[in-house]
Amino acid sequence: MQNKDEQQISGVSNSTINQAKGNIINNYGISAKDVIDIVNSVVADKMSVFHKEAEETAKQRLTEFNRELIKKLQDKAEEQIGKFNSPALQLAARKAAWGYVQSGDTNDKENFVDLLIERVSVEEKSTKQHLIDEAIEILPSLSPNCLQLLTFLAFSQLMKQSKISEYENWINSINPILDNISKVTSLDIDFLNQANCTFNTVGFHSSNSFIDNQLKSCDLLFRHKPPRNFVDKFFAKHQITRQDNTYLWPAGESFDKIMTLNEIFDLVNYPEIKMKYTTFSSVCDGLAKRGFSDIVDDIHDYYNQTQPYTKEEVEQYFIAKNPHWQDALSLLKREGIRSLRLKPVGVYIACRQLVKFTGDELSLDIYYK
């Protein structure tokens, strides 16, 4: 799966990922205080069940929720605040606030508030609106293990095409999930089905594994180094000379071409040459659009004169990044996981988590191409 999240090659876009000021008063006459009053009102009947210490704790959590909600509204959805007059939005606010009052978990507070901010911003009766409402219902029931498993499953279906340094950051961004992946149980897997986040396709599973997809998508990254004769030919072709660990370019060579070559090829560890980008097709397409057909020829030569990694070598690449990938890859090979598919609300919840981990914006559309 791929999402157009553009990768720069000296101005050429070729990168992809394969998936909240004061008091607010707007035209509807609703202020920040009104929003707090609305939230307090819609959960008042539920709050009445608490006694003594539990009552004080619940009130404190509700105050924390309201404070975070107002802050995010001011930052991200000031123009939409009037929607809190609608019954549908008040019902969503009731469920979100109550979810945090019950758990008291800081992450839950952030998740519920963010969901409510998104809910304010979407069109009523849209598919996105129904997904958000369902997510607000489901999220309180998901244990940390279930939420991390769901997020990892969504991550495992993506392929990122970018600079290798960006790809490595992307892989490393989910280390907090990997560190706990061994705690996932069969009960967690079954519960995701019960919670309507996933479903089983018994007897059917994808023929391509996570490793297959990475090997296919990152076909420049997962290759062995080129032979010395490629290096010599490359330096001779571009008339590059070395002097005291400094590269000298021929007089009259265009600055744009020099910068492009340095952008794509890692020449630091001569006589070894490495690629700085993950994907053959995206690099070649970007260079062709810039008119660098001679550099495209270099990429083709590099590709043809290097051997791809085996699946086992790709696995070792990930395990070297984080030993917990051993558990993660074993998990992905389990029959119960291979036949598991994410439902739309599961994809939605997982995408929101992945944005926090990776920093990449992910569209739901990448899972439905």
Task: Name each model feature, range by range.
Residues 1-49:
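Long, low-complexity intrinsically disordered regions enriched in small/polar
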Residues 28-81, 85:
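Hydrophobic face of amphipathic alpha-helices
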Residues 87-140:
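Long, low-complexity, charged/polar intrinsically disordered regions in eukaryotic proteins
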Residues 125-163:
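Short alpha-helical segments that sit at the start of domains
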Residues 162-170, 201-210:
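Short acidic alpha-helical/loop segments enriched in Asp/Glu that coordinate divalent cations
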Residues 167-184:
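Short helix-coil junctions and helix-kink-helix linkers
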Residues 186-205:
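A short, conserved structural fragment
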Residues 210-338, 342, 346-362:
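Short, amphipathic alpha-helical interaction segments positioned at domain boundaries
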